[in-house]
Amino acid sequence: MPFTASDICKIILAIILPPVGVFLERGCGADFFINILLTILGYIPGIIHALYIILKY
């Protein structure tokens, strides 16, 4: 599946502020709150989780 312009924007946002990318992809659900927790505990795990969510869905 090719990347769209919105996917590229979400990836850039996920690198800068990971919860925003997850929120745009999945909304305000469990994935969003998991990503907030991961970002607080460590910035890199938050980025990895955000990229996983964006690339999976």
From Swiss-Prot:
It is found in: Cell membrane. It is a multi-pass membrane protein. Coiled coil: none annotated. Disulfide bonds: none annotated. Its main location: membrane. InterPro entries: PMP3. Pfam families: Pmp3. Keywords: Cell membrane, Membrane, Transmembrane, Transmembrane helix. The chain crosses the membrane at residues 3-23, 34-54. GO terms for cellular component: plasma membrane. Plays a role in the regulation of membrane potential. Could mediate a proton leak. Belongs to the UPF0057 (PMP3) family. This is Plasma membrane proteolipid 3. The gene is PMP3.
